[in-house]
Structure formats: C-alpha cells, structure tokens
C-alpha cells in the first residue's frame, strides 16, 4: 500500500492524493457474485427528491458480500484474491471454500491471496477467521460484528474500522467502538478477528469536484446562500450568518444535535460515544 501525491500538471491534478495497492486484482470481478445496481438519483417512487446530493456517477455492479459466514462452519477457505469494491470503502476478498463454492467477504487487514481462513467455534485466533463472540479472547480486535445472532455483520465494516472486546459477563460481551461508545452485545453474535483493510482510505484526496461527481455525489449548497423560501437560513441583505442556531432545510437542529431515538436499546449502551 503506497500513498501517491500527484504532480500539479493541471489544476485538477494539483491536490490529488491516491492510495495505490499493488495486491488488488486487476481483472474483472467474479461474475456469479454480481448483481444489477440501479440508480434512483435520490428520488422516491413519486419522483420527489428524498435524499439530497445524490445523482449521476459511474455505472456499477453490486458485489454480493457474505456478512454472515454461519453456514460454512468448519469448512476451510483459501483467499483467491483481494479486489476493489466501488460500493464500499473497504476492499473485498474472494474466498474459495473446500466444497468449491466462492464467496466475497470484507477483506481484513493483513490477509492476502493464498491465506487460509475458516469460520466456526474451533477456528484458530487469527485475522480473518469468524467466531461467536463467546469464543473470542477478551482484548481482541474485531470487526464485522453482528447485533442480532444470524442477522449478519452491522458494526465496523468500513475501511480501517474495528472494535475491541473488553469484557464478557453472562450472555453478553462488552465492546469498545472506535467512536468511544461502549455497548453490550449478545455473546451468540459473530464477529471477524482483526480490523478492516484499506485503513489508508482516509488519507486520499480526490483533488477536484469532478471526482466526487464520478462517485454519484452532487454539490451541497449552503443554506445561507439560498432564499428564505428554500431554507430557514436563507435571505437577508448581504452576507449573513443565518441568524439562528444551525438547522436543516426542514427546521430540525443540525451540526451536533443528538438524533438518536431508539430508546428500546438504551440499556445496551454502557457509555455513550464521545
């Protein structure tokens, strides 16, 4: 993995910083694990914008990633290759199981082509192996963590993400997340050892607005630059600060206001995030 800073041969190249990984597969992805991915442009079935700043971008295929790994317990798998996935910040690994089936998983850091991985209670403590939390030693770094047994990984899936298993008590284990939050999760839930690959993703710089458009992201217009009919911060003579605490276009507090509303699981959070 190398960080490449481009020479300023043009305004669009001046600020480009790329992350180059020579281990990534340079050919086509595994066709049976691809699905059509249609674009909505941020519109719902009525044609109205429900998600702002979405539209355009390069056509993509969705890679079917196995977030469960619970039906391959005890079957060893060989990592065939590490691939780029346009749908996520992490890289993905193509596994070939001993029974001949191939599946994609989120590529753990340090795992490369030719490595042997396995899932199940008897799996050794090694990066890339998937176990129930009750079988993982306290202090281990993990990713791809389930919140409900059998539902599939939901926590720590993006590039460089991980959590630490810090305690085990009864049917629950306690995790420390990267945000600083400490929460309890059922010990039956699964997780993968190690941290997610491509941790240098945060060091890249796209360099120009067009590179963002290639990824399907449209411009963000500030509320203070709009008219009063379009945003609560709009209008005024000359440049203004908005005249009130920051709010969304619909008047809800933003920029730091707490939005968590799921009180049902509050008792699972030991310490709130920082």
From Swiss-Prot:
Function: One of the primary rRNA binding proteins. Required for association of the 30S and 50S subunits to form the 70S ribosome, for tRNA binding and peptide bond formation. It has been suggested to have peptidyltransferase activity; this is somewhat controversial. Makes several contacts with the 16S rRNA in the 70S ribosome.
Self-association state and partner proteins as the record states: Part of the 50S ribosomal subunit. Forms a bridge to the 30S subunit in the 70S ribosome.
Record's protein name: Large ribosomal subunit protein uL2
Organism this protein belongs to: Pseudomonas putida (strain W619)
Annotated region (Disordered), positions in chain: 28-55, 224-274
GO molecular function: rRNA binding; structural constituent of ribosome; transferase activity
Assigned keywords, A-Z: Ribonucleoprotein, Ribosomal protein, RNA-binding, rRNA-binding
Ranges in a coiled coil: none
Gene3D superfamilies found in the cross-reference section: 2.30.30.30, Nucleic acid-binding proteins, Ribosomal protein L2, domain 3
Entry-linked InterPro entries: NA-bd_OB-fold (IPR012340), Rib_uL2_dom2 (IPR014722), Ribosomal_uL2 (IPR002171), Ribosomal_uL2_bac/org-type (IPR005880), Ribosomal_uL2_C (IPR022669), Ribosomal_uL2_CS (IPR022671), Ribosomal_uL2_dom3 (IPR014726), Ribosomal_uL2_RNA-bd_dom (IPR022666)
Domain of life: Bacteria
UniProt-listed GO biological process terms: cytoplasmic translation
Family according to the record: Belongs to the universal ribosomal protein uL2 family.
PANTHER family in alphabetical order: LARGE RIBOSOMAL SUBUNIT PROTEIN UL2M, RIBOSOMAL PROTEIN L2
UniProt xrefs under SMART domains: Ribosomal_L2 (SM01383), Ribosomal_L2_C (SM01382)
NCBIfam families xrefs: rplB_bact
GO CC entries: large ribosomal subunit
């Amino acid at each position: 993995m190398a960080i490449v800073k481009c020479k300023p041969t043009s305004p669009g190249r001046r600020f480009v910083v790329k992350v180059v990984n020579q281990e990534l597969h340079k050919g086509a992805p595994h066709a049976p694990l691809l699905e059509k991915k249609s674009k909505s442009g941020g519109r719902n079935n009525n044609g109205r914008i429900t998600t702002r700043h979405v539209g355009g971008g390069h056509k993509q295929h969705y890679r079917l990633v196995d977030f469960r790994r619970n039906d391959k317990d005890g079957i060893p798998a060989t990592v065939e290759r590490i691939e780029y996935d346009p749908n996520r910040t992490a890289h993905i690994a193509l596994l070939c199981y001993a029974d001949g089936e191939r599946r994609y998983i989120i590529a753990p850091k340090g795992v490369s082509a030719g490595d042997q991985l396995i899932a199940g209670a008897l799996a050794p403590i090694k990066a890339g192996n998937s176990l129930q939390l009750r079988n993982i030693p306290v202090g281990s770094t993990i990713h791809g963590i389930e919140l409900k047994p059998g539902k599939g990984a939901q926590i720590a899936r993006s590039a460089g993400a991980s959590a630490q298993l810090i305690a085990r008590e009864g049917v629950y284990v306690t995790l420390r997340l990267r945000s600083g939050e400490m929460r309890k999760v059922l010990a039956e839930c699964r997780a993968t050892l190690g941290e997610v690959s491509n941790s240098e993703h945060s060091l890249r710089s796209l360099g120009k607005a067009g590179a963002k458009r290639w990824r399907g992201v449209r411009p963000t217009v500030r509320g203070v630059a709009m008219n009063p009919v379009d945003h609560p911060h709009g209008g005024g003579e000359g440049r203004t600060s908005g005249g009130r605490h920051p709010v969304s276009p619909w008047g809800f507090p933003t920029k730091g206001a707490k939005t968590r509303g799921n009180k049902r699981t509050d008792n699972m959070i030991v310490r709130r995030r920082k």
